[in-house]
Amino acid sequence: MIEESGNKRKTMAEKRQLFIEMRAQNFDVIRLSTYRTACKLRFVQKRCNLHLVDIWNMIEAFRDNGLNTLDHTTEISVSRLETVISSIYYQLNKRLPSTHQISVEQSISLLLNFMIAAYDSEGRGKLTVFSVKAMLATMCGGKMLDKLRYVFSQMSDSNGLMIFSKFDQFLKEVLKLPTAVFEGPSFGYTEHSVRTCFPQQRKIMLNMFLDTMMADPPPQCLVWLPLMHRLAHVENVFHPVECSYCRCESMMGFRYRCQQCHNYQLCQNCFWRGHAGGPHSNQHQMKEHSSWKSPAKKLSHAISKSLGCVPTREPPHPVFPEQPEKPLDLAHIVPPRPLTNMNDTMVSHMSSGVPTPTKRLQYSQDIPSHLADEHALIASYVARLQHCARVLDSPSRLDEEHRLIARYAARLAAEAGNVTRPPTDLSFNFDANKQQRQLIAELENKNREILQEIQRLRLEHEQASQPTPEKAQQNPTLLAELRLLRQRKDELEQRMSALQESRRELMVQLEELMKLLKEEEQKQAAQATGSPHTSPTHGGGRPMPMPVRSTSAGSTPTHCPQDSLSGVGGDVQEAFAQGTRRNLRNDLLVAADSITNTMSSLVKELHSAEEGAEEEEEKMQNGKDRG
């Protein structure tokens, strides 16, 4: 008992799953019932993966399950309905790539429970064939024109006239879909639904039916149907326009432009929910846009329209012939003919080995006439397929195809059963078959060798693209040179560091010496000031020279000694700027300049070593690539 109650709860949860997910989308906040109904049914269509199945795949599934041979009022059980739905989704997965496979079991469960909730509210466990066809043809993907053509073929007689009673039955079935998504008060079936579609009781042909259903606006009871198709077309349309209410920088889907407010545009979410701001009101007329045109395109279109260069608008659908196509009578097109041998065109050989013509050769002259008959049959079918892109689902057409296939199968079976060949023909055919088998074996061997070569080349390419330590050891000479270059580079860097340290120490010593010289000069100046024999030219002291910033590191002390002292303290530069009064200053200047020259040569040597190392690395890498 506990298990049974648990299974019942699980079954009820599965039945309510689709409706729970639909309520979670919060479609009820949409203000207009037409958009609300279309959004709900579009959600059901995508959730059940019906948008991946077009009307032609549905017709094929109906034929595979024998629904085209049943009367519209025939009732089928839920188990058979599940079989039909299973065949639809399993065939769909065969057509889809492996990366886009769907969950077949989940899709079957969702669609089956939705159809039972919509068409078997009384719980009888049976649905009519017409209900199944109407629902699946309406909810599947594909073009609306193809769907309406198929629906009309199910409601018309042999003369191509619509039967109003069947159209009324179609409205009853298709309007159960809005009722199933809780929109029955807006789009439920009434007795006057047929009159709203066709007010005048007259003969309705295919073109008139298509004109009415695809008109703008369509019949009131079916206004949600073309809107659902438009929703599918504009789901991924991008509009680089800012919404005037929510200030979203861009829009996806529909775009609505007010006809009264200047440059007032709303995204579909704001328009569906009735949002308005500023001078705009919900009572203003809005224009729906399903695409975006730049101002340049609008201007060019306006100019072309004013000049009369715009082509006339194409009709919403092609014009189809008023009279339906007459079924082909296969008894006259493929008349029965005497059963003949497949080898009647061969020449029989006598025991002497001399080829002698017999009645087989005479019969070979009649073959062109039979081939002409078959070619005429094929040409007629090709013409029909060119005129009608896809043969509609009708029992008479299926019976003709079955009769044609059965006749050809019987002919081939009889020809295969009544074959009588002379021994010479059998031996000749045996030799030919043997040669063919040998040729096939040779081709298979060549194919196998080619595949092995392709696999070998692929492995070599993978090994070449992924270098390993073993491969790196294949050229020890290059590795040794690279190792020496790196070692030399390290040594040069260490030497440069040591020279920089020595330069810093020398600069410190220079600073100390210059301080001593400056102090000595100050003492001498003080003594000269205090002595009465001091010359008056030395009484006022001397001005301090301004430091000079160096722009060259390689100048000699005889031309511009200040250029050699860039980077040292101001005291050093000041001392050397006063002239060459002492040998100590000259010695210091020469030492500083030699340090600078040594550093320059070291830097150049280091750069040349680095460039050489880079060239060697490139050579080694090129050698690896060629290897």
UniProtKB/Swiss-Prot annotation:
Fill in the subunit field for this protein.
Answer: Interacts with dystrophin short form DP71 and syntrophins SNTG1 and SNTG2. Binds DTNBP1. Forms a specific complex composed of DMD, SNTB2 and SNTA1 in neuron; the interaction with SNTB2 and SNTA1 is DMD independent. Interacts with UTRN and dystrophin short form DP71 in the kidney and liver. Interacts with SNTB1, SNTB2 and SNTA1 in kidney and liver. Interacts with KIF5A. Interacts with HMG20A and HMG20B. Interacts with OLFM1. Interacts with PRKAR2B and PRKAR1A.
Q: Which family does it belong to?
A: Belongs to the dystrophin family. Dystrobrevin subfamily.
* Region annotation Disordered: where it falls in the sequence: 520-565, 604-627
Q: In which tissues is it expressed?
A: Highly expressed in brain, kidney and pancreas.
* InterPro entries given in the database record: Distrobrevin, EF-hand-dom_pair, EF-hand_dom_typ1, EF-hand_dom_typ2, KCMF1/Dystrophin, Znf_ZZ, Znf_ZZ_sf
Entries under PANTHER family matching the protein: DYSTROBREVIN BETA, E3 UBIQUITIN-PROTEIN LIGASE KCMF1
CC terms in the record's Gene Ontology section: basal plasma membrane; cytoplasm; dendrite; inhibitory synapse; nucleus; plasma membrane; postsynaptic density; synapse
Annotated residues that bind Zn(2+) 1 are located at C243, C246, C267, C270
The record's annotation in Gene3D superfamilies points to: 3.30.60.90, EF-hand
Question: What post-translational changes are documented for it?
Answer: Phosphorylated by PKA. Phosphorylation at Thr-11 alters the interaction with KIF5A.
Q: Where does Zn(2+) 2 bind?
A: C258, C261, H280, H284
Q: Name one GO molecular function term.
A: zinc ion binding
The text the record gives for the protein's domains is: The coiled coil domain may mediate the interaction with dystrophin.
Query: What induces this one?
Result: Post-transcriptionally repressed by microRNA miR-143 during neural differentiation.
Designated name of the protein:
Dystrobrevin beta
**Zinc-finger ranges (ZZ-type):** 238-294
Q: What biological processes does GO assign it? A: neuron differentiation; synaptic signaling
* Coiled coil regions, renumbered to chain: 428-529
Chief location category: cytoplasm
Which Pfam families does the UniProt record give?
Answer: EF-hand_2, EF-hand_3, ZZ
Q: Summarize the protein's role.
A: Scaffolding protein that assembles DMD and SNTA1 molecules to the basal membrane of kidney cells and liver sinusoids. May function as a repressor of the SYN1 promoter through the binding of repressor element-1 (RE-1), in turn regulates SYN1 expression and may be involved in cell proliferation regulation during the early phase of neural differentiation. May be required for proper maturation and function of a subset of inhibitory synapses.
Lineage, uppermost ranks: Eukaryota, Metazoa, Chordata, Craniata, Vertebrata
Q: Which UniProt keywords apply?
A: Acetylation, Cell membrane, Cell projection, Coiled coil, Cytoplasm, Membrane, Metal-binding, Nucleus, Phosphoprotein, Synapse, Zinc, Zinc-finger
Composition bias type Polar residues, residue spans: 549-565
- The lineage's top-level taxon is Eukaryota
Tell me which species this is from: Homo sapiens
Provide the residue span(s) of the region labelled Syntrophin-binding region: 399-448
